[in-house]
Curated annotation (Swiss-Prot):
One of its GO terms (biological process) is proton motive force-driven ATP synthesis. One of its GO terms (cellular component) is proton-transporting ATP synthase complex. It comes from Squalus acanthias (Spiny dogfish). This is ATP synthase F(0) complex subunit a. PANTHER family: ATP SYNTHASE SUBUNIT A. GO terms for molecular function: proton channel activity; proton-transporting ATP synthase activity, rotational mechanism. Gene3D superfamilies: ATP synthase, F0 complex, subunit A. Keywords: ATP synthesis, CF(0), Hydrogen ion transport, Ion transport, Membrane, Mitochondrion, Mitochondrion inner membrane, Transmembrane, Transmembrane helix, Transport. It comes from the Eukaryota. The lineage of its organism: Eukaryota, Metazoa, Chordata, Craniata, Vertebrata. Component of the ATP synthase complex composed at least of ATP5F1A/subunit alpha, ATP5F1B/subunit beta, ATP5MC1/subunit c (homooctomer), MT-ATP6/subunit a, MT-ATP8/subunit 8, ATP5ME/subunit e, ATP5MF/subunit f, ATP5MG/subunit g, ATP5MK/subunit k, ATP5MJ/subunit j, ATP5F1C/subunit gamma, ATP5F1D/subunit delta, ATP5F1E/subunit epsilon, ATP5PF/subunit F6, ATP5PB/subunit b, ATP5PD/subunit d, ATP5PO/subunit OSCP. The chain crosses the membrane at residues 14-34, 69-89, 99-119, 137-157, 180-200, 202-222. It is found in: Mitochondrion inner membrane.
Amino acid sequence: MNLSFFDQFLSPSLLGIPLIAMAIMIPWLIFPTPTNRWLNNRLMTVQSWFINRFTYQLMQPMNFGGHKWATILTALMLFLITINLLGLLPYTFTPTTQLSLNMAFAIPLWLTTVLIGMLNQPTVALGHLLPEGTPTLLIPILIIIETISLFIRPLALGVRLTANLTAGHLLMQLIATAAFVLITIMPTVALLTSLILFLLTILEVAVAMIQAYVFVLLLSLYLQENV
């Protein structure tokens, strides 16, 4: 019974063909593309306002060199939010609960920010490995610690997103199962459990959006250090 709770995190397949690629492509079909041939409706207006506000808040603390990343980070933000929210629907699959997918986003983007710093400002980039004013005896130890913390960054990005979404989905399934079992035995308790499930669902919607924002925000902070 305990193992069945994790079946929702298995990559679905049809006739031996994995369907995770279809789940990844669906978000791009949801957002309408602006065009000059038609007037913008309310959905397009809200979408444009959200993208502009997010891009402004993300790029404001950066210098001009980091503004080239605005399109990539905004697209990644919309992609993660859409996948996370679609995964809350019944009988759906959430690709971002797979650590492999999150690491596939985290490692290349983090590595790109590091390479940009090494190519453009090698002295400043290497200076991050040694805090200013460090005693001579602590220099080797601190360099090792800072190097390890540097390489842990992509792992922290991927694991944070995976762990939060996985924990939320498991908790929702546990409470939903309890409500379903108790509905014939103790209807009052089942009603209270359903209310808790409703509140938890609202919380998970917020977590789905917040975790996507945190993922992109941390990438922008890593980029800000190297541009």
